[in-house]
Amino acid sequence: LIIGGAVSGSTAVKKLTDEGIRCVVVEQNKMPYGKIEDGLPRWHEKQRINEYFKIDDIISHELVDFVPLTRIGKDVSFEEIYNMGWSCIYFANGAWKDRSFPIKEIEDFNNFYYQNPFVYWFNHYHEPSYNGPKVDIKDDAIVIGGGLASIDVCKITQLELVRQKVESKIENFDIIEMEHKGIPKYLEQYDMKYEDLGINGTTLVYRRNIENMPLTTIPEDATPEMVEKRKLARRKILNNTLDKFLFKVAECTQPVGLSYDCLLYTSDAADDGLC
């Protein structure tokens, strides 16, 4: 039995069916796409479709029984599942729910959002029938994280800040085209400059240094030379992204508490906290 049919679940299914082992996949949603469906911003359309095809191909195998719209603990208890006598129960329920922020008071903070509902909003707010969570993008936002998902959130906030300034001035404004070209090049074709828009911009707050951002993988058996190259590649990847989307990065910094209407930080790169 495999609980969850997206990336992790379908990978397990592939390995098992390759060995001739029958699988039952239980999925809480209608389709087994997990965060691929709405965890990726809408400009990742080609990647999303490719992943859909991969998962569909695996789940449609003759040795697979797919059970959608079934939640463990709600539609069927874990005790019931345990007593069914499965040879193996594999949990692949993924990151459908954001990990709670360690400073509990932050949830009372105006305009505080977790990544999952934030990206869901971005993917759907333009649809006429949209009735989901509302997000109010403000200037001087901070994004706390350091992986690819947090960079996507920084890109969204920057793109939305620019959209607020120029959408009424550009016929057929296209936020996806702006993502593909980058903010400076997109504005340039309309004789506009980011510096003239009066935007302070988004800041990405990361607790480690840029070389440790998980933007490229480093194999466990990597040589010291390869490790150094991969770390340099991480900084290069981030710098290229900064050039295109113009957000800022505060490395070796993490929030430690709240003070009235702002976050307090500690930074290894400075003697004092900042607010």
Predicted features by range, described:
Residues L1-E19, C154:
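N-terminal Rossmann-like FAD-binding beta1-loop-alpha1 element of flavoenzymes
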Residues D56-I103, V256-L264:
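Feature captures the FAD/FMN-dependent oxidoreductase FAD-binding
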Residues Y52-P68, R163-S267:
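A Rossmann-like FAD-binding core segment of flavoenzymes
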Residues D98-Y190:
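Glycine-rich dinucleotide-binding loop and its adjacent helix/turn
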Residues Y265-C275:
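Single conserved hydrophobic/aromatic residue that forms the stacking wall/gate
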Residues I21-P32:
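Glycine-rich FAD pyrophosphate-binding loop
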Residues K30-N50:
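Conserved N-terminal glycine-rich FAD pyrophosphate-binding loop of Rossmann-like flavoproteins
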